[in-house]
């Protein structure tokens, strides 16, 4: 009798340990890859000086990395239907590390471009497969762990470029990149040793029937639209914020501090809003964050410099908080065995929006001025609210435990 009652408890404890190991491994991996993504901002001025590159070439380098990362996420999700996601994650991490290692050995702009394409291709595996692994490990309780996973990316964005800057004090940039490449290989080894198998994205079903792509339901597409617009608001505002603050009399150091306040608030928002979404629900949380974003943007426009600076951390919380709620909802609107495809499409859309939105808002700014363009970002945030109401109807239709089917 004791053994029969202990067995389920032991199985549950083992599953919990496995889920925690999955979250820890994917979190470390997320920090590494997001840090790799932002390393290029530190490196571009160095490469411009050493190789005599023009601004067009520098922009091309950034575009090649971002394009490889965004464009290969959906293929990575499909590959996970045939190969364990853990294996693909490890391979992607090794490839991203080797890309930066190759950059450290490059002697020309063409070599750097090739290295960045390789690194971007490696990083393309991380978002969809790691998110799906966390969602699968935690099942119905995945929303808060996905918020934590989302938060770890901000830790990487803050720490790894800063680490590179410190390394550059003591060694040439080529050696510094080698150090970071070896760090990436160490993360890959850590994942191989500690992360449980993630499983394949698609499992066999009775009669060999393949399941239709439920990830592309109407509810998912509404969630996708919210993600695209939310990213557009964030990237559009960040494009104009330095100029708005300078118009209020902010110096260059003050502008840098202001952006840091937004980013710190954003990291806190990613961490807390996943938890908040579990308690308030998706609709209320999205209405809170998007309404707060619109109010915060208008407050920054209307207030003098000092009060506007005080608003920025809270604006950062609202600006980034929605994303954790959205990522946590992806598994609820897709079949468990198709999470990789759903996350791949979702991340591709948000990354693409982050690339296109500043251009569109920039055209608006050229025509009507930065204030009008910034007001347009607030209007976009408000426009998300009716889409959230439409999404809520689809969430209410989900049966209990639907994400586990």
Region spans (language model):
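Cytoplasmic helix-loop-helix junction between adjacent transmembrane helices
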Residues: 115-153
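Residue-level signature of mid-helix packing/kink "hotspots" within the transmembrane helices
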Residues: 38, 66-74, 158, 263-271, ...
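Structural signature of the two symmetry-related core transmembrane helices
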Residues: 87-101, 284-299
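Extracytoplasmic gate region of multi-pass secondary transporters
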Residues: 40-41, 218-270
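Interfacial helix-cap and linker-helix signal at transmembrane-aqueous boundaries
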Residues: 47-48, 79-80, 166-171, 245-246, ...
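C-terminal membrane-cytosol helix-exit motif in multi-pass small-molecule transporters
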Residues: 181-204, 387-392
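Conserved MFS/SLC helix-loop-helix module at the cytosolic interface between two early adjacent transmembrane helices
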Residues: 71-109
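A late C-terminal transmembrane helix in Major Facilitator Superfamily
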Residues: 331-333, 337-370
């Amino acid at each position: 009798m004791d053994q029969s009652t202990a067995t389920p408890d032991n199985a549950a404890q083992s599953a919990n340990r496995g889920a925690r190991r999955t979250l820890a491994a994917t979190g470390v991996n997320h920090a590494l890859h997001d840090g790799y993504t932002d390393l290029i901002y530190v490196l571009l001025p160095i490469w411009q000086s050493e190789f005599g590159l023009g601004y067009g070439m520098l922009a091309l380098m950034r575009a090649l990395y971002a394009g490889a990362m965004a464009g290969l996420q959906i293929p990575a999700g499909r590959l996970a239907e045939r190969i364990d996601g853990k294996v693909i994650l490890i391979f992607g991490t090794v490839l991203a590390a080797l890309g930066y290692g190759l950059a450290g050995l490059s002697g020309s702009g063409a070599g750097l471009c090739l290295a960045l394409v390789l690194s971007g291709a490696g990083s393309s595996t991380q978002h969809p497969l790691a998110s799906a692994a966390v969602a699968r490990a935690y099942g119905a309780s995945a929303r808060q762990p996905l918020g934590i996973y989302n938060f770890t990316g901000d830790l990487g964005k803050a720490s790894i470029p800063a680490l590179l800057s410190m390394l550059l004090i003591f060694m040439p940039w080529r050696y510094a990149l080698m150090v970071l490449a070896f760090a990436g290989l160490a993360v890959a080894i850590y994942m191989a040793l500690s992360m449980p198998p993630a499983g394949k994205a698609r499992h066999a079903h009775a009669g060999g029937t393949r399941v239709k792509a439920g990830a592309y339901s109407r509810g998912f597409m509404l969630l996708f639209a919210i993600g695209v617009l939310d990213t557009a608001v964030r990237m559009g505002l960040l494009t104009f914020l330095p100029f708005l603050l300078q118009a209020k009399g902010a110096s260059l150091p003050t502008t840098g501090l202001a952006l840091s306040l937004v980013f710190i608030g954003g990291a806190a928002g990613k961490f807390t809003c996943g938890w908040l979404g579990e308690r308030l629900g998706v609709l209320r949380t999205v209405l809170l964050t998007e309404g707060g974003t619109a109010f915060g943007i208008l407050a920054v426009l209307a207030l003098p410099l000092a009060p506007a600076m005080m608003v920025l951390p809270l604006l950062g919380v609202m600006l980034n908080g929605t994303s954790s709620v959205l990522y946590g909802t992806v598994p609820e609107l897709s079949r468990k065995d198709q999470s990789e495809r759903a996350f791949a499409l979702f991340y591709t859309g948000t990354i693409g929006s982050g690339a296109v939105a500043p251009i569109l808002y920039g055209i608006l700014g050229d025509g009507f001025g930065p204030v009008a363009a910034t007001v347009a970002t607030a209007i976009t945030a408000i426009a998300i609210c009716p889409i959230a109401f439409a999404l809520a109807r689809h969430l209410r239709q989900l049966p209990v435990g639907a994400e586990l089917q």
